[in-house]
């Protein structure tokens, strides 16, 4: 009997797992996703060009054999990196085993959602994983409102902003939300480039009616990078009628672009005016706090412990692009894994030396250390120098001595002098005590990391 393409692909992966290592499956194959069947070719989305090369060179023959065993057909495979592929209306369903033979754990809800989705949306791009800050708060609120009540609030919703700022993330999040909360809704996500290519192919094949039906009979149309519609007169004409058909059916349209409608060159005025009918909102480059939060969220989602001094260094030096921001973190983590070294500030500087300007040595002073520690522990600057033995004062003083020893070139006598003329043996005792506490108390070690990050940021 016929069954979902995704279910067949899952069976194929399970079959492959019996003939290769589990590590290989988890690292390379498990993240792939079948996005369409065109004649006897299954189009499979992978996460990037490197993954595409790996799949083609290493696993494609095994997967083709698995498909032959399962479907009794000589299926071909085509791997595409970061796919935005719309299902072909003439695509043939795959012959598969009886549904009773499907592997355990196949998700019926997931398969049902895929049946209502044209195109590909990244499973990681949800509202829950989107980090909200001052630069994107309005766009996030508008996207969520549209997802909750499609075609009732802002229609169309037009989101614009620079490359890598989160426009596509929000569009995918809308798609996920609608599919999860509306059991009958049909969603299409497509890039303007793919829409154009599909339209050209439909003209060549004489299948424009099928093409039009596919896009005009959805409940939510998410179209990315609409600026690439500029100069394409025939595609603009087609999209104009698609836009009207969806609006007249009281369905939702969400559009993204790298610029507002009025700045898209050679765009027909009738399209420009329609893009301005609903709500236009922009996404700006994230501020430092948002960039830091994005990195921490990324690290948390990957299950990686990243010191604050590392995230602060990356967030401070990469200011305009979230993709570059996350890419830098990935590079640092990979660098640490390859060298089998802990993640540190110095390692991050080394890992990113080819993509970031060289760090100018910053002179950290004992005065700066004392100021940061005093603010953190709510004591006065003069408390570092007085003969006060209470723990509320003595312990922060020992911390400041330890940090002075670690972050400056000052000698032990010089450090002692800066802390009320204390003997160098007192400084040694303080450094040894704090070092021991760092080793035995992870929470305290995290506090020290935060203090170091703040000192370096001053």
Curated annotation (Swiss-Prot):
One of its GO terms (molecular function) is ATP hydrolysis activity. ATP binds at residues 164, 166-168. CDD domains: AAA, Bac_DnaA_C. Pfam families: Bac_DnaA, Bac_DnaA_C, DnaA_N. Gene3D superfamilies: 1.10.1750.10, 1.10.8.60, 3.30.300.180, P-loop containing nucleotide triphosphate hydrolases. SUPFAM superfamilies: P-loop containing nucleoside triphosphate hydrolases, TrpR-like. Residues 1-93 are annotated as: Domain I, interacts with DnaA modulators. Its main location: cytoplasm. It is found in: Cytoplasm. This is Chromosomal replication initiator protein DnaA. It comes from Symbiobacterium thermophilum (strain DSM 24528 / JCM 14929 / IAM 14863 / T).
